[in-house]
Each structure stands twice: as C-alpha cells, then as structure tokens.
UniProtKB/Swiss-Prot annotation:
One of its GO terms (cellular component) is cytosol. This is Thymidylate kinase. It is an enzyme of class 2 (transferase). Pfam families: Thymidylate_kin (PF02223). Its EC number is 2.7.4.9. PANTHER family: THYMIDYLATE KINASE, UMP-CMP KINASE 2, MITOCHONDRIAL. SUPFAM superfamilies: P-loop containing nucleoside triphosphate hydrolases. InterPro entries: P-loop_NTPase, Thymidylate_kin-like_dom, Thymidylate_kin_CS, Thymidylate_kinase. ATP binds at G7, I8, D9, G10, A11, G12, K13, S14. Phosphorylation of dTMP to form dTDP in both de novo and salvage pathways of dTTP synthesis.
C-alpha cells in the first residue's frame, strides 16, 4: 500500500508518518518511510540544492529539480518496495509540486501534470492525507516565541520556507483545490487538532478503506 502525506511546512506530516509507521509495524507489516525530496543519494543531493538559501533558482528550474528527485526515488526505491509488498509512507509526493510550483509559483498546471506523470511513472497513492493548516498557524508552530513578520526572514529557515505568507496562502489554496477535486484519494484533516486526534482519523480512514492492513500479522519490519 502506498500512502502519502501532504500539507504546508509545519502542518505535522512528519509526526503523523512516525505515528502510523509505529502502528503498522506493531501489526507485523513491512514499512518503508521516505520523504521528498530525498530517499536516494542523488535525491538527497538535489534536496540540499533546493533548500540552500544561497541558491537563486528559477521556478521552472525548481520544478525540474523536484521532478528529477522524484524520478530517482520512484524508480529506485518506491516501486521495488511496493513490488515486495511493503507499505510505503511518503512525506510529500506530486501533490506538493502542484501546490507549491503550480499554485504557489504560478507555473502552468497542465505542464506540471505532464511532468508529475513522467517523474512518478504514473504511480498514484492509494490514500493521500492532506493536513490542512493556515500559513499563520504553521509559522507560529515553528516560531512560537517570534513575531510572524520576523519568522519568514529568520536565518533558521531554508530557501522554500522563506517564500512568505502570500506564497504559502496560494499553496494552501492549491492543496484545498486538489483535495476537493480528488475526494476519493485525498483525505483532508484539520491540522489544528492534537496529534493523537489526527492519528485516530488517519487510522479510521485506513480501517474503512483497507481494514485488512491493520490486522495483526507475524513479525514486522521497519525499512
């Protein structure tokens, strides 16, 4: 099973990936957890380029770098893992490209869909959990002791995180549009809820769609 997690930075995706991984392993499943960009040596190198503050990258260059990272990850790691019947949990996938580079940067959505299809080898998640959070709340989480205007320019932020409030508002709107257009795949969850409450909603969704996944099996392997 292939499960992806989406949302703006600070929405709590990584926390939910860890919580679900722990649950699935306790049920005896082989679980592989990954992030985008990353997951292979080449993809991690691309991640460093994309997040480095000193790098002035054009929107189309950014798009193609994300696509290159994804192509490496899908072909070298995700597809082989799924073929071996592992459950793959991925922090970000092509919905991030549509939301960030499409709605956020203003690139042509039809072009993005073509590139996403090529880079992902037409692989589609079984379920995508979109954790919905306002940009203001996201930055408050990251910088609870700082004012919002200062936070977007803080030296601790990476290149993507410095894109600003208006950018992240467009990204959030993009995510909401994607979720509304694909309700069978994308499950929207209020990210202002407590982590345990979000986790319960995630497990309830999996139970309703793939209940057999949470049945106890022998063993359990974390990849």
């Amino acid at each position: 099973m292939f499960i992806t997690f989406e949302g703006i930075d600070g929405a709590g995706k990584s926390t939910q990936v860890k919580m679900l991984r722990k649950l699935l392993i306790s049920k005896g499943l082989e679980v592989l957890t990954l992030r985008e960009p990353g997951g292979t040596d080449i993809s991690e190198s691309i991640r460093d380029i994309l997040l480095e503050v000193k790098n002035d990258i054009t929107p189309i260059g950014e798009l193609l770098l994300f696509a290159a990272s994804r192509a490496e990850l899908v072909q070298k790691v995700i597809k082989p893992a799924l073929s071996d019947h592992a459950t793959v949990l991925l922090d970000r996938f092509y919905d991030s490209t549509s939301a960030y580079q499409g709605y956020g940067r203003g690139l042509d959505l039809a072009l993005l869909h073509q590139i996403n299809r090529i880079a992902s080898c037409s692989l589609e998640p079984d379920i995508t959990f979109y954790l919905d959070l306002s940009p203001e709340d996201a930055m408050i989480r990251k910088f609870s002791e700082k004012s919002l205007p200062l936070a977007f320019e803080d030296e601790e932020l990476d290149r993507m995180e410095r894109s600003g409030l208006e950018f992240y508002t467009r990204v959030r709107n993009g995510y909401q549009t994607i979720a509304a257009s694909q309700p069978r795949r994308v499950v929207t969850i209020d990210a202002t809820l407590e982590p345990d409450a979000i986790h319960r909603k995630i497990t309830e969704t999996i139970m309703s769609r793939r209940g057999s996944l949470l049945q106890k099996k022998e063993g359990g392997v974390e990849a």
